[in-house]
Amino acid sequence: MKLTIHEIARLVGAKNDVSVYPDSPLVKAEFDSRLIGAGDLFVPLKGARDGHDFIETAFENGAVVTLSEKEVADHPYILVEDVLTAFQALAAYYLQKTGVDVFAVTGSNGKTTTKDMLAHLLSTSYKTYKTQGNYNNEIGLPYTVLHMPDDTEKLVLEMGQDHLGDIHLLSELAHPKTAIVTLVGEAHLAFFKDRSEIAKGKLQIADGMEKGSLLLAPSDPIAEDYLPADKKVVRFGPGAELEITDLIERKDSLTFKANFLEKSLDLPVTGKYNATNAMIASYVALQEGVSEEQIGQAFQNLELTRNRTEWKKADNGADILSDVYNANPTAMKLILETFSAIPANEGGKKIAVLADMKELGDQSVQLHNQMILSITPDALDTVIFYGEDIAELAQLASQMFPIGHVYYFKKTAEEDQFEAMVKQVKESLGAHDQILLKGSNSMNLAKLVESLQED
C-alpha cells in the first residue's frame, strides 16, 4: 500500500494536526486488531463491537497510526468524522492514484464464480488481483482495494447488495472500467419490494462508470428499464448478442461454444450456468487482449472459491456435489436441474439434501414450494429436507415419492434436528451413490460435508 500518514490525513480531511507525526509509509490497512502488523494503519470500525476499544491492542501489535472518531492519547491518530466513510474515501483515492483497471461483477447467482473466472483469465496477461472470499460489501471492497499488491494492473471486484443503494455506493467508489451483471434472481428478497427492485439495485453497478464503458447484462425483460443509455450494453442469453451455441455437460466437466468464439472451450466444472459464467468472462478477457488460445489453456487449471458447485468424495466412496455457500430460488433450481441430468453411477442412487434458502422475506415459503417443479422421482431416489420454511415443500415432495424416500428435519428457534438429519443422510448414502447438498450458508451444510468425508 503506497500511502503515507500525511497523505492519508490530507485525503480524509484530518481534524487534528498530524504534522507532529513522522510521515511514515504504511504497509497495509486492517480493521481487525489481531491482524495488525508492523507499519500498519488501524481502521477502528463500529459493528457488534466498537473498534475504538481495540486501538491500544492495535498499537501493541505494531500499528503506526489509527483513524479515530475521538482523540487518542499517546499514539499517532488521524481524527475523522466517520471512520467507515474515511476508509471508503481512502480506497477510492488509492484506485485513482494507482490507475488500476477495475472490473466489477454482481448478480443474484454466479457472481463469485464469474469473478474467479475473469481474474483467472486476465492473470494470463496481467498482474491481477480479485476480491477474496466474500469481501464484497461497503467494508470488504475498500479492504480489497487497499490490500491489492503494489504491481496490480487489473482488479476484479465482486459487489454484493443487501439493500437498494449498496451497489451504487460501491460503483461510485471503484469507478469500474467494465461491469458485469450475471443474473437477476430473488436473492435477498427480504430487503427488496420485488425482483424489479433487485434489478434496479444490480444495474446501479454502472453508476460509477464513464460514458461508453462496457456493461454486460442478462437478456431479461425485468432488467431492460434499468439499463443505462450512455454505456455500451452487451446482453447475453438465448438470442442475445452473446449466446451459447453448443453445450455438452458431463458429471464433472463441460464443453461449450459461444457465438463469438472460434473454438469450443472445455471447463473442469459442471452446470450449464457455469458455461454462461465462462462465456461472460471469456468475452471480457478478449476485450482486454487475452487470446482465445490463452483462455482455453487457462480454463484447464481453473480454481474456484470453495463450496461453489464442487465435487467431493465421501469416506464411503459416494460422490458429493457440494453447493453449500449460499442459496436462492434461481440457484437451487439450476443446481437441481444439473444434478438431475447427471446419470446415476452404476448400482447407485441419487440423493438430494435441500436446506432453507434465507432472506426471502414474506415470499419465502411460496418460493421454497416452487422448487417442487425441479424435484422429481424420475431423477432423484431420495430427498432429505432440513429447515423451517422448507417444511411445506417436504410435504409436497412426500406426495410424489414412494414412502420412505422423503425425510424432513426441523431447524427452528425452538428445535434443531441437525444431528438426526446427518444420521439419516449417512444411513441413506451408499458407496456408489451421488448426493447433492444445497442450502444457505447459515444452514451449516458445510459441516455435513465434513462429516461425510471424515467417517
What are these regions (language model features)?
Residues 68-74, 180-319, 341, 348, ...:
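Acidic, Mg2+-coordinating active-site environments of NTP-dependent enzymes
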Residues 1-89, 270, 373, 378, ...:
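N-terminal leader/targeting and accessory segments in enzymes
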Residues 78-82, 405-421:
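Short acidic-hydrophobic, aromatic-tinged amphipathic segments that line or gate anion-handling sites
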Residues 33-43, 128-129, 139, 143-154, ...:
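Mobile, glycine- and charge-enriched loop segments
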Residues 14, 69-70, 100-106, 180-186, ...:
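Short beta-strands and strand-loop turn motifs
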Residues 49, 305, 324-401:
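Active-site beta-alpha connecting loops in nucleotide-dependent enzymes
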Residues 6-12, 86-219, 223-232, 423, ...:
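Phosphate-binding loop of NTP-binding sites
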Residues 105, 306-308, 434, 442, ...:
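ATP-dependent carboxylate/acyl-activation modules
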